[in-house]
Amino acid sequence: MDLTGLLLDEEGTFSLAGFQDFTFLPGHQKLSARIRRRLYYGWDWEADCSLEELSSPVADIAVELLQKAAPSPIRRLQKKYVAHVSREACISPCAMMLALVYIERLRHRNPDYLQHVSSSDLFLISMMVASKYLYDEGEEEEVFNDEWGAAGGVAVPTLNALERGFLSAMDWHLYTDPREIFEVLSWLESCVAEQQGRWRGWYTYTDLCVLLEQPTWQLALGSLCQRLVKLSCLLAVAYVSSVALAVASVAVIHQSLGLSCIPTPGPPDLGLTSRCLLEPCIPSVPQCLPSLANVSSCLEGSMGLRSLWGSLLASLTPPPLPPPDPPAPPTLLHNCHLCQKLQRDSPTCHACLHPNRTVPTALSSPWYHTYGLAPPWPWSPVLLSLPQPQQCSLFSVMELARLKSFVFPG
């Protein structure tokens, strides 16, 4: 609360004319409401909640502060003594705050005085000097030294000596700027709010408002908010990065699995080509067909993981065996070493379209192919046209039988 708001009225002017007719200064009611709400004085005017004595939280703060300021073990200040003196001498909150200003001055100007005086005497004499400064002679709130002595249990001569020593230590500088009073009030409010919040275990709305007005709490709250914002940003970046990494990993794995089924292009295997051409006629068909089926299934398996596993299982499954051949008639026929069947025709095997003799490997290579077929490479889009199985000629079988009888007579 600003000091200007206390001295000026609602119109923003303050006139000395008719000053005696004012019961309160402008803004006094706001200050009283602030003290009652934040210093725990209470709102019941008819009960024992007036501003003529210190509240329990303020008394606790006063005891703690005066015990630290005057560490003498003689007549150590207690809360019961503070409550008794404040009730008997009608100590107001403003007198309490002014006394705290005086004690703070003594800590900086004359710390030796605080080492020799007891905390109880310091409380009594500081409250008495502050009350005399605020309430001049002729006011209803003035309290004489004998009344202060009776309230504090101190003789009047002793009390007078304590007063002279206190004024000497203060160097008679009792004037206090109102801004210092409001600074002490703000500090006292924060101490009370923090102490009561810790004692209860939770803070009220008023306590939080008081604490957030302090520069220390504002800096702490600002630093906490900045750290929370930084932590939130880091967590958001980490989350987005993890999601992007997971999506990229799934895409790369899926693409690699799809491409692994398709063989990479390379030079043709001449041995494989010649070996496929020299295989027997009937078994060669089911042995070459699975490789072509694997290529087509792999091409289709790149569209999905399910088809990929199906093609993998199909490639691992062995091809079905061909049906057994019917028993040959007991004739003297030659046995074709390529077709594994009895030949009855010319020496040329029409089933595999190759003569029944040793075929050079170089003729089966794709560079010397004379039939105009596409190269039998796995990556070629044109599939290798396989010859249709046919029965071997009877003349070739008879020729082989004659050759056998000639080589092995009898």
UniProtKB/Swiss-Prot annotation:
Q: What is its main location?
A: membrane
* Keyword annotations from UniProtKB, A to Z: Membrane, Transmembrane, Transmembrane helix
Sequence similarity: Belongs to the CNPPD1 family.
Pfam short name (any one)? Cyclin
Q: Which Gene3D superfamilies match?
A: Cyclin-like (1.10.472.10)
Presence of keyword Nucleotidyltransferase: no
Q: CDD domains annotated for this entry? A: CYCLIN_ScPCL1-like (cd20557)
Recorded topology in the membrane? Single-pass membrane protein
Q: Where are the transmembrane segments?
A: 233-253
Q: Is Membrane found in the keyword set?
A: yes
Q: Please report the name of this protein according to its UniProt entry.
A: Protein CNPPD1
Q: Which residues form a coiled coil?
A: none
Question: What are this entry's molecular-function GO terms?
Answer: cyclin-dependent protein serine/threonine kinase regulator activity; protein kinase binding
Q: Which GO terms describe its cellular component?
A: cyclin-dependent protein kinase holoenzyme complex; membrane; nucleus
Q: Which gene encodes it?
A: CNPPD1
Localization in the cell: Membrane
Q: Which InterPro entries match?
A: Cyclin_PHO80-like (IPR013922)
